A protein has these predicted regions:
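Extended, non-catalytic structural segments that build the interaction scaffolds
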Residues: 28, 34, 277-301
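An internal, acidic/charged active-site-proximal segment
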Residues: 142-264, 348, 354-361, 367, ...
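Basic, amphipathic alpha-helical segments enriched in Lys/Arg and hydrophobic/aromatic residues
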Residues: 316-373
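Short, conserved catalytic/metal-binding motifs centered on acidic residues
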Residues: 44, 83-95, 122, 174-182, ...
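Active-site-proximal, Lys/Arg-enriched surface segment
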Residues: 58-134, 248-253
Length: 398
């Protein structure tokens, strides 16, 4: 099965893996796609080759290098020349009083703060092919824990990314994030550690045109800026216009007062009928082309599709443990299963569909179980003839 071969190939890139761990890990990753319902320890024990306690012990391996595992998959299957790191927090529903770091976090789907957990997903986006695979995830601390660390949420996000910069920067130095991260307290530490950040400004942000005046040789520094930018009356002589399918796109280099630095700005004016007047995207690499800024930012949304697939089909919200190590392993294993499904589809040369992929693997798994428990000598010619038809049965019906 292509899914299993991709998993084994990626696992070999992780150092210090012993044979018992490899067997249990391979079986668990297969079960993330083979189990049709909730994916928890009870279900793993029912469907898997090992006992429930064996899977619980597996999920306690906090030293497993998910970045290396996923990085191996990404290096083979994201083939575009332009890549970037996308980050995005995601709300995970969870109840109980004993769960570590449980608190109130923003749920974009509900449009409000809800009690539960939050993970920050780190993905690699392929701008040329509009694809994304996750590199890893980390659970977000609750407010009480952040207070004990003497940090706010933005500080914690930046400090974690900087702590993993060796692995991240080996893939790309460009980090793409939503408007929540367009704060000086996030941008400055990232830039000081050789990252470039692409994000989005609020519509009322204060930006200035760089001055066009030349040095006169007289005493005193010439003025820095030629005035604040009025986006309702943009000076088109300073901008480069790009052709886009919907609306108008302009790019220019500006000074951002809040960030205390020059940035490359992409201004998109949507078509008539939209309620918003303009959208402002920026890159801290002030030499970046305006169209590229927009392309990078829009590809960021592919990371949210990884979360969607993980929640709907890979059981990312189903972990019932109150152990921090097991929660972390479960979140990362779920997202890695989505990566493996994408890789398997690419290897087979078929269009990616997480639903169809899950149906294929579930059907193949059940057929293998039937053949194993019959206790008779199977007719391999008949099996080879009907195997493909049977595993495709559910997908065709869907």
């Amino acid at each position: 099965m292509q899914y299993q071969s991709e998993c084994l190939s990626a696992l070999k890139s992780v150092v210090n893996i012993h044979k018992p761990f490899e067997k249990t890990f391979m079986d668990a990753m297969k079960l993330f796609m083979a189990i049709p319902d909730r994916i928890n320890f009870l279900q793993l024990g029912r469907y898997g080759r090992f006992s429930e306690q064996t899977y619980r012990n597996l999920f306690e391996h906090e030293t497993f290098d998910w970045f290396a595992f996923n990085g191996s998959i990404i290096s083979k299957h994201l083939t575009g020349k332009r890549k970037a790191i996308a980050i995005d927090p995601s709300y995970i529903p969870k109840s109980g009083k004993k769960t570590p770091w449980i608190g109130y976090f923003w749920s974009g789907c509900a449009g409000e703060y809800k009690r539960g957990l939050e993970i920050m997903g780190i993905g690699v986006i392929d701008i040329d092919n509009h694809e994304c695979m996750t590199l890893g995830s980390i659970q977000t601390p609750d407010c009480k824990t952040l207070d004990n660390m003497d940090k706010n949420l933005v500080d914690w996000y930046s400090s974690y990314l900087i702590s993993r910069k060796d692995k991240i920067q080996s893939i790309s130095r460009t980090v793409v994030a939503d408007a929540f991260f367009s704060k000086e307290t996030f941008i400055t530490p990232m830039c000081e550690n050789d990252f470039h950040v692409i994000s989005r400004f609020r519509n009322d942000v204060i930006l200035y045109y760089p001055t066009l005046e030349q040095k006169t040789g007289k005493r005193g520094h010439p003025k820095w800026f030629d005035g604040r930018i009025d986006f309702a009356n943009l000076d088109l002589t300073r901008c480069k216009e790009y052709e886009v399918n919907k609306g108008k796109l302009y790019g220019l280099r500006v000074y951002a007062k809040a960030l205390k630095r020059y940035v490359s700005l992409a201004i998109w004016y949507p078509m008539d009928g939209r309620t918003d007047k303009w959208q402002l995207y920026f890159s801290t690499d002030d030499s970046m082309d305006g169209r590229e800024v927009l392309d990078y930012y829009r590809t960021r949304f592919q990371l949210e599709f990884c979360f969607r697939d993980g929640k709907q089909h890979a059981g990312i919200t189903n972990c019932q443990s109150t152990d921090f190590r097991k929660l972390d392993f479960h979140f990362n294993a779920s997202l890695a299963a989505v990566n493996l499904a994408k890789a398997a589809c690419k290897r087979l040369g078929i269009a990616y569909s997480i639903s169809s992929c899950k149906s294929f693997i579930h059907n193949a798994y059940m057929l293998e179980r039937f053949i194993c428990v019959f206790g008779i000598n199977p007719d391999m010619q008949v099996i080879d003839k009907l195997f493909k038809e049977l595993i495709l049965f559910t997908a065709r019906a869907a």
